[in-house]
Amino acid sequence: MGQETEISKRYQVAKERYQAIGVDTEKALKTLKDIKISMHCWQGDDVKGFLNPDGELTGGIMATGNYPGAAHTPKQLRQDLEKAYSLIPGKHKLNLHAIYVDTDEKVDLNEIEPKHFTPWVEWAKEQGLGLDFNPTFFSHPMFKDNYTLASPDKEVRDFWIEHGKRSRKISEYFGKELGQTSINNFWVPDGIKDCPIDRYTPRKRLMEALDEVFAEKLDEKYTQEAVESKLFGLGAEAYTVGSHEFYMGYGITRDKLICLDAGHFHPTEVISNKLSSLALFSKGVMLHVSRPVRWDSDHVVIMDDELIEIGRELVRNDLLGITNIGLDFFDATINRIAAWVVGTRNTQKSLLKALLEPTADLKKMELENDFTSRMAITEELKDFPFGDVWNYFCEINGVPVGLDWLKEVKAYEKDVLLKR
């Protein structure tokens, strides 16, 4: 009996078990296939980019490790991404930062244009991918005194305002060329190391600068903007201008998506608990699925409680339609392609786990105060053959099942990465 027959056979058994509790596995698999994950380019080169790859990584973030094989050119990065996507079921998106320009021109962040990203667009067309975007408000000499858009220096603010405006045009270009809405996410690391006297004025400057960046109305068929908060970063421990409250207020009043990064809050605070509230009041959500270990460490996403809870919240509350799921982690201590594959597949698995729940029945039990049945069923579900459904999903989408993907990554490492 071949592996394919065995996987299909095990799936049929699992299908019947789920059917017995009212879950349609075929419907779950169809829904999962339609969910695009926005995989981040910066895992592939440790957030160096191609604008100034030898420059310092600033903005209060840090990539640690020196595992061999990091990409040094756009061509190498695309080659690595192709390998990763070939091991992940479904068709997805790539999330680009502005520093990942692909051009022979000497260009600065306040000069970037769509043409500097044309090779990415042509490649995305060939691969059947969408593209999301991020202006890069860090790793640049104009990141002065820990400030960009909130700087008291008008010259600094104006530089970054221009960068933000140009980023919007690039995101719009992606959407027009690829026929998929490009999400353009604004994260600004501005902050202060020690306790400030004036918390209000920098936030007012940031608000006014963002208003100027977003002044021109763009067609949301092509691009939508998200704004991302953060609690603190290295060198900005006491105060971050773009706090959660700031961007929640800004996003709701300016009709922007609100980006929630799993690592950008207090260590005991989780973004899964925020989704239902934001869904009531905001236009929609951009997720940066990450794994904070004691701080915003951007560890690779594993199948932990919070990832499972994020999947549940999105599915149980029917939020998939207003949520854009992206990843944000960068670990230079392990094979970078493996990092992409593990993180993306785990995010998909968390969604599948949630899609395999009898959600309507569980909600009915809860409404009727039948908490006994609710507990019994949710606990029993933990032992259901979820893995057999996932393996079948991988098989029908033509990607390796189980750990077979690791063999391919190891071979690629030997043949390609270790020769760089």
From Swiss-Prot:
It catalyses: L-rhamnopyranose = L-rhamnulose. InterPro entries: L-rhamnose_isomerase (IPR050337), Rhamnose_isomerase (IPR009308), Xyl_isomerase-like_sf (IPR036237). GO terms for cellular component: cytoplasm. Keywords: Cytoplasm, Isomerase, Manganese, Metal-binding, Rhamnose metabolism. The keyword Cytoplasm applies. GO terms for biological process: L-lyxose metabolic process; rhamnose catabolic process. Its main location: cytoplasm. The keyword Isomerase applies. Pathway: Carbohydrate degradation; L-rhamnose degradation; glycerone phosphate from L-rhamnose: step 1/3. Its EC number is 5.3.1.14. Its cofactor is Mn(2+). It is found in: Cytoplasm. Belongs to the rhamnose isomerase family. HAMAP family: RhaA. Catalyzes the interconversion of L-rhamnose and L-rhamnulose. PANTHER family: L-RHAMNOSE ISOMERASE (PTHR30268:SF0). This is L-rhamnose isomerase. It comes from Listeria innocua serovar 6a (strain ATCC BAA-680 / CLIP 11262). The lineage of its organism: Bacteria, Bacillati, Bacillota, Bacilli, Bacillales. The gene is rhaA.
